[in-house]
Swiss-Prot record:
Gene Ontology CC entries for this record: cytosol
CDD domains for this protein: AdoMet_MTases
The protein's name in its UniProt record: Ribosomal RNA small subunit methyltransferase G
Organism in which the protein naturally occurs: Thiobacillus denitrificans (strain ATCC 25259 / T1)
Gene: rsmG
One MF term in the entry's GO annotations: rRNA (guanine-N7-)-methyltransferase activity
Keyword Cytoplasm carried by entry: yes
């Protein structure tokens, strides 16, 4: 099975209706990630088939749970989940932030080559980031534990906004250590085609 066939089968299994050019852009992104990864070590996953399941489909599995108009992907690294999200949901304005300049250089190159007008890239530490407007959703795939995640980004979630944290096993201990003023509003167990590991999407909300 080619990576294109694997991606198409995975998208169908997830029940996603993607824009007409999404599959082509997702595969082009994967090729870029593979190319840059040889120099910049953006991901430990190097096999093309595993990159489809562990990166593309893992990110796409969370797509239906994003509401609102603006999203911040914290510690975006190689652009996960932000770039697949921006490709799958052109209605969203997605901002990627990472403190490592070589990673944001890759993200800017991907934005340009893929023609993602709804994508912005910021180099810097998230705790120092002061955008003109706060975000409907702040998300992360591999940034930190939940307590640190919400503490460092609380100033970036707008009133009525949410955090969406992508996790492996259900994070019982991390949830027990959440700071005051934050509540768990939902937990979605994600079933990712080709990925046998446990995946949870934890939805958190600030308590006004």
């Amino acid at each position: 099975m080619t990576t294109g066939q694997q991606l198409a089968a995975g998208v169908a299994a997830l029940g996603l209706a993607l824009p007409a050019d999404a599959t082509q852009k997702l595969l082009a992104y994967l090729a870029l990630l593979d190319k840059w990864n040889r120099v910049y070590n953006l991901t430990a996953v190097r096999d093309a088939g595993r990159m489809v399941s562990h990166h593309l489909l893992d990110s796409l599995a969370a797509v239906p749970h994003f509401r609102g108009e603006t999203v911040l992907d914290v510690g975006s690294g190689g652009g996960l989940p932000g770039i697949p999200l921006a490709i799958a949901r052109p209605d969203l304005q997605v901002t990627l932030i990472d403190s490592v300049a070589k990673k944001t250089a890759f993200l800017l190159q991907a934005k340009a080559e893929l023609g993602l007008a709804n994508l912005s890239v910021v180099t810097g530490r998230v705790e120092d980031y002061r955008p003109a407007a706060r975000f409907d959703v702040v998300t992360s795939r591999a940034f930190s534990d939940l307590r640190e995640f919400v503490t460092l980004t609380r100033h970036l979630v707008k009133s009525g906004g949410r955090w969406l944290a992508m996790k492996g096993l259900y994070p019982h201990e991390e949830l027990a250590l959440l700071p005051q003023g934050v509540k768990v509003s939902a937990d979605y167990e994600l079933h990712v085609p080709g990925l046998e590991a446990h995946r949870h999407l934890i939805v958190l909300e600030p308590v006004e």
